[in-house]
Structures are given as structure tokens and as C-alpha cells.
């Protein structure tokens, strides 16, 4: 099976939980032995672990034709993407995007992470997804969280392939009810267009069903997992707390959601 995956971050450049989750599911799918993953990231740096997936640098995918040679493309983007892919993507530009702010390669730049113009970058990412979806071969689309839902929808409309969205958190979780209407609309649009909705917990699944009015039959709880501790860590002697004051460890962010 070939998976076209849309992510927003990936180790070692971790801005939030998405990077770790994206890495984990990529490694897990790759370990099955019969899954090939093409992972689209807005701004990879070139030092990402590519053992489990092919990484597409969305900031190096052209949306406007530029007459450049192979050596120049190699010089500009060779550290993050195969120059041959640049020319393959260039052959699948589907509209005149010269009115957009593009660089000398006809590509759009991304800040990486979560900049102040995040909604603009989400929209730009979805435009580029149309080029990638027309160029790659895949059987299913996997989109991580609301940031990539528009890209996943675009890829589905282009290809007709099923869309599986991965809900790591909803805006109800992040805001505890004070929902951003723009974010909510993007989330709901992604869910409405999805063929399968993966939720990280049963609580999230119930939120998706009741707050976003989704069919329970396409919503599944897919719990996050943890890596086994290294043996050297398991061998660390446990402290003796008998007779001492009880200690509670909280491992998480100090947010309403946690």
C-alpha cells in the first residue's frame, strides 16, 4: 500500500506533539513491510530521518513555471529534495499561480512551525498538495490534524482516493469550549470530507461525534503508544519511598486541556 501523508512537523525539529506522533506512525507503518509512505512537510531541514518515508519538501514544489536547469535546482534544494522530483512536479502544475508570492524556482516559502500567518501557510500548503497529488502514486491519504485537512481534501478531490484524517486534538480540547470559529470550520470540513476519522482517544472520538456531528461508524479510537524503555533505564534502581511523603509526578503541559 502507498500512503500520501500530510504532516506539519517531524523530528528532530519538534514544535509540538505532532512531530512525535507523525514519526511514530510513520515508523510503525514502515515496520509492516508492505507500506510505502510519501510524507509532505512544509519546511523540512534536510536532517530528518528518512528511513521510514520519502519526504516531500513542500517549499520546493513549484506552483509556477520557471525555466531553470538541473544544476541550479540541485544547488538550491538538493539538500532537502531530489532535483528530479522538482521537474516531475513542475510538469503537473495545474493552474496559473504567478500571482502568488513565489521565489525564483516558482515555489512558496514556509516559515516552519506555527507563525503569525499560519492560516495563509495552511492555504498555501493545500495549493501545493494539488501538484503533489497529481504527481505521486498512492492508495490512501493520511492527514494529521486541522493544519493539513485542506491539503488532504484537495488531494482527495484530485485523485478520488480515500481520505483518513488523524485527529490528535480538536479546538474544543485546546480551548475547553471557547472555540475559534475559523479553526472549527476547517476541522469540520476535514471531518465531513473524510472517509475515516482516527481519534487519539475515546474522549476525542466522542467530541468528534457530538460536537462536529460525525457518523460514529467512521470514527475510530486509535490510541497513541509509547516506546519500550531502554534496558539501561529499566535497570536504574527504584528509590525507596516507604514511609515518606507521597509524591505525584505530572508529566505534561500546564494547559486547560491537560
Question: What does each model-identified segment do?
Answer:
Residues 1-15, 40-45, 58-60:
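Nucleotide-activated donor-dependent transferases that construct or modify glycoconjugates
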Residues 130-135, 180-197:
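Membrane-proximal helix-turn-helix segments that form the acceptor-binding/catalytic region
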Residues 203, 225:
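Carbohydrate-associated surface elements
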Residues 9-21, 50, 258:
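A short, glycine/small-residue-rich beta-strand->loop->alpha-helix junction that serves as a flexible
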Residues 3, 140-142, 149, 153-174:
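Active-site proximal beta-strand in glycosyltransferases
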Residues 28, 34-133:
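A conserved catalytic-core segment of Leloir-type glycosyltransferases
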Residues 240-258:
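Conserved donor-binding/catalytic core segment of Leloir-type glycosyltransferases
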Residues 141-142, 192-202:
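A short beta-strand/loop micro-motif in the catalytic core of glycosyltransferases
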Amino acid at each position: 500500500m502507498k500512503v500520501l501523508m500530510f504532516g506539519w512537523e517531524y523530528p528532530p525539529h519538534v514544535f509540538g506533539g505532532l512531530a512525535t506522533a507523525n514519526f511514530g506512525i510513520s515508523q510503525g507503518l514502515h515496520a509492516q513491510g508492505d507500506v510505502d509512505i510519501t510524507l509532505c512537510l512544509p519546511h523540512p531541514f534536510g536532517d530528518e530521518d528518512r528511513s521510514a518515508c520519502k519526504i516531500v519538501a513542500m517549499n520546493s514544489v513549484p506552483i509556477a513555471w520557471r525555466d531553470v536547469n538541473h544544476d541550479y535546482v540541485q544547488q538550491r534544494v538538493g539538500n532537502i529534495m531530489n532535483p528530479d522530483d522538482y521537474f516531475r512536479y513542475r510538469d503537473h502544475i495545474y493552474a496559473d499561480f504567478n500571482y502568488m508570492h513565489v521565489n525564483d524556482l516558482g515555489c512558496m516559502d514556509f516559515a516552519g512551525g506555527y507563525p503569525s500567518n499560519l492560516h495563509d501557510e495552511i492555504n498555501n500548503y493545500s495549493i501545493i498538495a494539488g501538484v503533489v497529488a497529481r504527481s505521486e502514486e498512492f492508495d490512501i491519504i493520511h492527514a494529521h490534524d486541522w493544519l493539513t485537512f485542506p491539503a488532504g481534501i484537495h488531494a482527495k478531490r484530485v485523485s478520488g482516493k480515500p481520505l483518513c484524517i488523524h485527529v490528535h486534538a480538536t479546538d474544543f480540547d485546546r480551548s475547553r469550549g471557547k472555540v475559534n470559529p475559523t479553526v472549527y470550520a476547517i476541522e469540520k470540513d476535514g471531518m465531513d470530507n473524510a472517509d475515516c476519522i482516527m481519534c487519539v482517544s475515546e474522549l476525542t472520538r466522542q467530541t468528534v461525534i457530538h460536537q462536529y456531528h460525525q457518523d460514529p461508524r467512521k470514527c475510530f479510537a486509535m490510541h497513541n503508544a509509547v516506546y519500550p524503555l531502554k534496558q539501561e533505564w529499566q535497570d536504574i534502581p527504584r528509590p525507596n519511598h516507604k514511609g515518606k511523603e507521597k509524591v505525584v509526578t505530572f508529566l505534561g503541559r500546564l494547559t486547560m486541556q491537560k
